[in-house]
Amino acid sequence: MTRSVWKGPFVDAYVLKKAEAARDSGRNEVIKIWSRRSTILPQFVGLTFGVYNGQKHIPVNVTEDMIGQKFGEYSPTRTYYGHAADKKAKRK
């Protein structure tokens, strides 16, 4: 179920503060955030966020296509190594 329209998008307050500070400073550095649940807003376009995946910060360059998505969608938490090969089939 999607979020109610009347509530508006959810963004942690510290993410907004960090984004505003980065915009004002003009420096293009990675903004480290831990809030995977925050929604990407239009004012974040052009900024680079380091989204934490449980081990490290994954750099995410925000584009216009990402608006409305969550930061967590661009920072995978699990590594897929593929299915294990069938040992019986290898012996033949």
From Swiss-Prot:
GO annotation (BP), single: ribosomal small subunit assembly
Cellular component GO terms, alphabetical: cytoplasm; small ribosomal subunit
Cell division keyword on record: no
Segments crossing the lipid bilayer: none
GO terms, molecular function: rRNA binding; structural constituent of ribosome
Entries under InterPro entries matching the protein: Ribosomal_uS19, Ribosomal_uS19_bac-type, Ribosomal_uS19_CS, Ribosomal_uS19_SF
Keyword Ribosomal protein tagged: yes
Assigned keywords, A-Z: Ribonucleoprotein, Ribosomal protein, RNA-binding, rRNA-binding
Pfam families (UniProt xref): Ribosomal_S19
Described purpose of this protein according to its UniProt entry: Protein S19 forms a complex with S13 that binds strongly to the 16S ribosomal RNA.
Family: Belongs to the universal ribosomal protein uS19 family.
HAMAP family named in the record: Ribosomal_uS19
Protein name as annotated: Small ribosomal subunit protein uS19
Origin species: Ruegeria sp. (strain TM1040) (Silicibacter sp.)
Record lineage: Bacteria, Pseudomonadati, Pseudomonadota, Alphaproteobacteria, Rhodobacterales
